[in-house]
Structures are given as C-alpha cells and as structure tokens.
C-alpha cells in the first residue's frame, strides 16, 4: 500500500473510532452526493489552508495546547488531535488532525438549521447562536474532529469574551465546536495558534489565492 493511501486510511480509521458514530455516519454519507455539496466560490479574496509536514512532527502536542489556550477550551476538548501511528514498515510517526475545511463539506449539507456554513475566505464556521446541538454534523464529518459542548463553559475573563461564528469564547453549552482556522488572527495578518506555537515548524498556513 502506498504511504499516501495508508495515511488516508489511518486518519479515517482513527476518526471513526474517536467519533463512535460509524453506522450513523455511513448512512448519512450514502445519502449525500459530493456533487450536490457547495464548493468554494470563484473570485474569493482568500482560501486559507493548513499544511502539515509529517516528517517534522514529533508528537509534542504543543499545537493542541496552543489551540486550547487561544480558544479557552477545557482540557478534554481537542480541536487538533495528534495521533501516533505505525506505517507498513513498522516505523512510528505522528499525525495531527483538525478540521479539513473540506471543499465539499458534508457537515454543511446535513445541518438542518444552516448553523454550519462556509465563510467567504474558505473556513467552515459554526454559528453557535443558532446551533441546536443535534450533532448531525458530527456524524457526517469523515474526520471525527468536531466536539460537543456537554458542560457549562469554562470561566473566561471579560475582555476575552467574544460572540460570533468567527470566534466564540467561551463555547456555548449544548452546541458543537471545532477548529475555526483562527480566522480572527488570519484576518489581522497573524498566524493561527497551532502554527505559531509549533516548535518543529511542522504546521503551516497558506492562502491558495494569494500565495
């Protein structure tokens, strides 16, 4: 098996185990045709994307911690998860997985209240003010990277609070959360938290339109 194929299978397998929604997800995906899903529109000013160099990642988890700190997430919520995997030759490597901001996102298609949508510059966002917590998007996500806010939000300083789909601090109880590409930082010309805190320089962010 080629390494690329192995990585895709390993990532999908880990996501399915983490999500615990195998049967439900497969049923949804059978009903969703990729050709029916919205792609990024032409003429967009930006198209933010992540690139991860697996040769550099040492599994330190600093990206996860940085994300949690930036978004005031509890310790049990990981918007970027680092998996330890073994390749066909028996060697170990680490695979960070976050929201892939799919070109044709199943989560957008299945959301019954349009709480999940694509922004003009590419990232898939969640408007927690209208999310009903049905978790259909979690079942549809092929990467298992969405989390549910079961508990009351963590204590957050007043100056750090922010309400909006681009940045929700703290998270709203009873809704779904996920990587937001640190869009609030990117629009100011700054790097996402996971990128700036990666000591191995394994995580990159680029713009498919301008770079």
Where are these regions (language model features)?
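Iron-sulfur cluster-binding cysteine motifs and their immediate structural context
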Residues: 21, 28-33, 58, 62-82, ...
């Amino acid at each position: 098996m080629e390494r690329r194929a192995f990585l895709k299978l390993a990532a999908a397998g880990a996501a399915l185990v983490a999500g615990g929604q195998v049967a439900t997800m497969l049923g949804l995906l059978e009903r969703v045709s990729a050709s029916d899903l919205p792609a990024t529109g032409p003429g967009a000013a930006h198209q933010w994307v992540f690139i991860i160099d697996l040769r550099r990642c040492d599994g330190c988890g600093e990206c996860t911690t940085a994300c949690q700190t930036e978004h005031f997430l509890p310790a049990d919520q990981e918007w970027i998860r680092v998996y330890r995997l073994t390749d066909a030759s028996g060697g170990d490597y680490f695979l960070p997985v976050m929201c892939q901001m799919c070109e044709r996102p199943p989560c957008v298609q299945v959301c019954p209240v349009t709480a999940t949508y694509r922004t003009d510059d590419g990232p898939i966002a969640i408007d927690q003010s209208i999310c009903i917590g049905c978790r259909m998007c979690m079942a549809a996500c092929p990467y298992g990277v969405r989390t549910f806010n079961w508990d009351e939000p963590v204590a957050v300083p007043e100056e750090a609070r922010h309400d909006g789909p681009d940045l929700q601090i703290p998270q709203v109880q009873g809704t779904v959360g996920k990587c937001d590409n640190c869009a609030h930082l990117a629009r100011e010309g700054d790097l996402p938290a996971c990128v700036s805190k990666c000591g191995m320089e394994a995580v990159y962010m680029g713009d498919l339109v301008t770079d």
